[in-house]
């Protein structure tokens, strides 16, 4: 019997597939990137001509330029608005003509706004350049001006290490801040957000703009009069604590990608307009953009609450899988997956005492088994995670080598690893709100980014974010020498060669940086250097608190530094003059990473700002990348020709094969990220509808029209069938609307659907009018608003859970030759329609049944009011608590789920304020009595 075998889709081989086509097109039309650079160079020439004008100004005159530019912006806006109004009138006239040639034109307000800023750009950039020189003593190079233009125009600017990206961000930030709509400068961690803000804030302050900072659990405003002497770094001493709302109201706000995203979610959970933190999402400049938008692209931000699962099952299955042998399972290292063999299934069934592991009643056992097996076989300690002395399992970022505090693997995997390591298992959690970085950053009106390594991901930036990558030329030519890879037969031979190379350069006095992909390999190299009695500093996620001190000395004469990928990003190793004369920093890569970007980041530590330097990678056939992608074949060939362990080969073909393997992995990851965003786009549409609906209710004082709309929809829905057809007509109707049962029978007996709907709506409207008379219009409006928000929040949380369950099982549809994505879209639409139906019915049921005894909404005291029973009533109806949450990050790339060990009360500010006001007013009432 033949079987249909579905061919596996090959991963996208980015760049390689399009090389020939690109070359042909460039031959005909020229290189578009070069054309862009030439265009920007002309703009810079215009900026340079303005330099003498601003140099001649006094400080006071320079400060006044911001107000003058804002006035100029307003004038240009008025002209643009007038032009837009005329165009709209013209379009309306065209569309009103019933001809075949209807106008398809639309007014692009974003483009119009950017055109206005383009006119101000030369003066704004020249002004910032002069102000920066006066305040910081640094003048923007022409290439930095080009970088600023690229960012303003919504591109990714690739700028090499040491080219001054922090200073470049000043230029577009200032220009776009003139609109008074806010600018967000996004960094990867709290330290960089504070450091960069503290560095640039004096320039913004000099020019009359204020700067805010958003980090985890804190927010600041730059104030030169404020001094916090506890900060050792002078750049951070003037950051004055403030509310989050004040920090977001600043002209320019620095912060981390996590906190910007979390605050967006938190704003869509508040019940009072006053507790909203963010303004509109206008313009974002993302530093290390490849890290945030590519490496963390499949990283949903999650606000979650404990779900209270029993941890005993995790310990039970950790014990079971520890008894399995390699013959009991098949490990797929390429896809990081593991499956049981028939022998393994039989062994597990014996250990569990069951006959059929995969029967329906054992689905929960399969869930625990899968995660325990992955924890045991796929995930390794000191490579994928570390275990602290306090017994906490912390994930290690595979791209940066840093510890990812507050992040947890999802779907029970983190708990399975905790059980494997014998530490306390933390409970699972339920999702309250979530959004991926892909969809969050696409909410911004304009998006741009900068990094040292983006070109290899140019296709993904364009396809997912509509961002073009522009390679900004360095200010000084690169003198670094990148040597060919050395390939060894065994890892031991490779490590001995690394030691010999380190000894050679160390004898000359050159500083050496040895990079590795994991803590395990990092510590293994350290053992080899110990045997050779070579002094070194070691940097990995276990001692990251010493990072600044180690990096500060890494460029000194004779320094040897062993580092994981931590040293590849965000570090700037500066060299003294004597080291430059010796040949600069020597960078040794102890293996190739899955991603070419990570390799390029390591290379980029050497040769900064035109400094000399040498880089070289040492590779063995036993390295993961080589071993997985046919490294054994090469090892056999080397053994056959009699090559010993310590003799390397210089073979460009092997290096090209390695790079091809990297491209295949990158292509696979790209396809995977595209797949994730296709699924995430489905729930993103639901999210946008719900959040828009929620914001309208939150900001609207009177939502009675919305309630009337719900009543009309609900009555039509409930009266489609008569009571003759639907025997549960009366029961279903009374479950939603608390009205006279006899009248419901009359409605159900009517023949025509429109007659049933009309009478039902009249009856329900009368009942609702009676409710309003009972409470009074003002109180009724507050009841409507509070109930609507509470029910919507509860149903949205349930919807997120339902969507997650749907997503987890949808891939099985492919067995029936059905497209899982199409099925997911269809099923999710049904779920969303169910949410809308339940929203109507739950809101109306509560509003028509609530009594004064059940819910005293407000108590007026001297013209003020406070909430009493309403919140309890709504929460009882929804049976959901939204008080204590975890903030963290879920990463589908490596199955991450957030869950910060630190609990955060999402309603803390609101509840504290309410309790305080309530107590004060009660005291007033008692004193009056």
Residue ranges and their predicted role:
Residues 386, 391-394, 402-407, 609, ...:
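Extended, charged helical/alpha-beta scaffold domains that provide interaction surfaces
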Residues 1-5, 926-929:
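Short, Lys/Arg-enriched, disordered terminal segments
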Residues 2-642, 692, 709, 713:
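Conserved P-loop NTPase motor core
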